[in-house]
Amino acid sequence: MAQLTGSEILAKALKNEGVEDLFFLMGGPMLLAEESCIKEGIRPIDVRHEQAAAFMGQAYSRLLNKPSVCMAASGPGVTNLITGVANAFVDCVPLVAIGGSSPFKTYGQQVFQEIDQLGMMKPCTKWAERVYTLSRIPEMVNVAFQKAMVGKPGPVYLDCPGDLLYEKIDEEEIDWSISGRALPRARPHASSEIIDETIDVLRTAERPVIITGGGILWSDASSELQEFVEKTQIPFYTTPQGRGVIPEDHPLSFMTVRSAA
């Protein structure tokens, strides 16, 4: 009966979620996981500092409108990720951060590079959790992707103890039941009453300006926004997180028509 290591299970689970590219800085205990990702056909993008991996993942997600994955070694590798992860939290970017950690069996004994990585990640993520059993790795990976995308997008963190990554388990014991489950796409709708009230306010407004943020980007509503702008002829301004949803050289761009607003 074939067996898989935790690292191999992690790589296969990421592949099932549609991951094509991985941003990381090689280091233990993630070396086998990173090698396994490459064997699964995931393109490795190795950086010189973990913070760069998180920022590159953030840019990747914004450009492709989908989750990205960054990976780091235990201890200082994970702490180096935090600034990039925190930035993704502020900008509502679905970044999946995966960090190696000291062995689960020796937690609390101050072993090599042991630090409370979960405690540091929780304030700057939507969800942070640790892998406890090999059989549930695919489930945990899918939940991480689900949490990153549901509602307002944002970063998540999955902590992977080194001893679990190198342990083996029979393939038939692995739970793949929700691996690769379709991701939610947040497109919230206002009630008809609020929409009617908004229309009434716009009818009586003298110098309206539309201000849009990153929600337009993540809900994939750029075309709807542009249609609304052009039908109403209301100038628009985008926050830094929402730039590019309508071309900035559009005749109704705030930078172009601000003197008429």
Residue ranges of predicted features:
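N-terminal alpha/beta PP-like core and its mobile active-site loop of ThDP/TPP-dependent enzymes
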Residues: 1-261
